[in-house]
Amino acid sequence: MKVIFAGTPDFAAAALKAVAAAGFEIPLVLTQPDRPKGRGMQLTAPPVKQAALELGLRVAQPEKLRNNAEALQMLKEVEADVMVVAAYGLILPQDVLDTPKHGCLNIHASLLPRWRGAAPIQRAIEAGDAETGVCIMQMDIGLDTGDVVSEHRYAIQPTDTANEVHDALMEIGAAAVVADLQQLQSKGRLNAVKQPEEGVTYAQKLSKEEARIDWSESADIIERKIRAFNPVPAAWVEYQGKPMKIRRAEVVAQQGTAGEVLSCSADGLVVACGESALKITELQPAGGRRMNIAAFAAGRSIEAGAKL
């Protein structure tokens, strides 16, 4: 069975490797163009391209698929049975969706219809969801509105960051899409179920502005934001006129004026919130490395009563 693969980041690269390891023929891999990255802004291939080249697969990197006759013709010439799409980052128009014999399967990191859109992992943590998961979806022209082929649940742990949930769902998604491809190969079809009309939510793209900590919010809300926005864009506060990223924190039963430092020691930097307080245990000063509070406090002095 011929499988076109379309994806860009690590989340997708894991799925590509799994599909290849399962023995499926992959005549073409689509990924986004190389982009400048890092402090040196060096042109860097996306993880999917790197994985595809290691596997000896053909790679194409169109800037867009909409109104792109050359890309459409390339897809048609492959005569694929199905396309697997994972965090590709480009819109697939209807003519592209219709090209493979069995359409396009998307690996989506939420329990649809909850958290359709760009940042499902982060929004699930931010909202305090007890669980999330992966859906393999038969793509249509809508935003994550297609019928669900399979659903795979994951319990969000109280200390999980977005990075940790991402890595868990990456492995779940890779295994799930392989299982569904194997079913398609053996039965010639997939049983997909329409998404319910109730419970639809949208996972809007993250912004640096919303990641700024508002100490008037409750400690519970802020703690979830810190985990949801870890590693990027990273929750932050202004410290000595510069943004300081907050990487880890826990809720503690203390009270004070919102934004007031209650204590600073090797154990943690405790800051009062609208309700309760947060004990910050890991942070990253502007231009610096991530560090625990013991390392931070050793070179600085933040007195009780100071404002963040």
Curated annotation (Swiss-Prot):
GO terms for cellular component: cytosol. It is an enzyme of class 2 (transferase). (6S)-5,6,7,8-tetrahydrofolate binds at residues 110-113. Its EC number is 2.1.2.9. Gene3D superfamilies: 3.40.50.12230. It catalyses: L-methionyl-tRNA(fMet) + (6R)-10-formyltetrahydrofolate = N-formyl-L-methionyl-tRNA(fMet) + (6S)-5,6,7,8-tetrahydrofolate + H(+). Keywords: Protein biosynthesis, Transferase. GO terms for molecular function: methionyl-tRNA formyltransferase activity. InterPro entries: Fmt, Formyl_trans_C, Formyl_transf_N, Formyl_transf_N_sf, Formyl_transferase-like_C_sf, GART_AS, Met-tRNA-FMT_C, Met-tRNA-FMT_N. Belongs to the Fmt family. Attaches a formyl group to the free amino group of methionyl-tRNA(fMet). The formyl group appears to play a dual role in the initiator identity of N-formylmethionyl-tRNA by promoting its recognition by IF2 and preventing the misappropriation of this tRNA by the elongation apparatus. This is Methionyl-tRNA formyltransferase. It comes from Neisseria gonorrhoeae (strain NCCP11945). The lineage of its organism: Bacteria, Pseudomonadati, Pseudomonadota, Betaproteobacteria, Neisseriales.
